[in-house]
Amino acid sequence: MISGVGALIGRLVWNSQQVDPARSASLAYQNAVTAVSEGKPDSIPAAEKFAAENKNTYGALASLDLAQQFVDKNELEKAAAQLQQGLADTSDENLKAVINLRLARVQVQLTQADAALKTLDTIKGEGWAAIVADLRGEALLSKGDKQGARSAWEAGVKSDVTPALSEMMQMKINNLSI
């Protein structure tokens, strides 16, 4: 009986040690993101510090939020750096795909089409095929490769794509003819 109670107490202590760091990271992430979205002074440096110190999913998510702030301010180099940091902080393949998609968009805006194409090559999974095709078309078009862009968008239209994205890619194909 006593050993059973001891084991139960030990298990509860161990569980609390595992849950408490996750809770505090979650709370710190929420506070950082809220402060940034509210435009509080010094919130961006604090969020950057949080992202740099948390080499986990919360750090990666903070990097995504920061990258959006930098894109909104047209600070694209800073956005790209945050996205690269976010990639290093997560092992989740879907989160990596989202980060890589955003990174490729930023790279296209920075006229780094070759880097964007390499970034897009790292995204795996059929669920991402249409979005990757759309961005691939944008990157190729920015390099002046109209035929490559057309091929990418045509492949995107043929993939399992939402009607809205399909129509948008079809409009891009049609605009190449003009």
Can you name each region flagged by the protein language model?
Residues 19-23, 57, 94, 127, ...:
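Residue signature of alpha-solenoid helical repeat architecture, marking inter-repeat boundaries
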Residues 42-43, 78, 115, 148:
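Alpha-helical positions within canonical tetratricopeptide repeat
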Residues 1-17:
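Single-pass alpha-helical transmembrane signal-anchor segments
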Residues 36-37, 48-52, 59-131, 136-139:
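Alpha-helical adaptor scaffolds
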Residues 12-24, 51-55:
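TPR-adjacent "capping" and linker segments in tetratricopeptide-repeat scaffold/adaptor proteins
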Residues 22-42:
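Short extracytoplasmic/periplasmic juxtamembrane "stem" segments immediately C-terminal to an N-terminal membrane anchor
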Residues 142, 146-178:
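Terminal, low-structured helical/coil segments at or just beyond the last alpha-helical repeat
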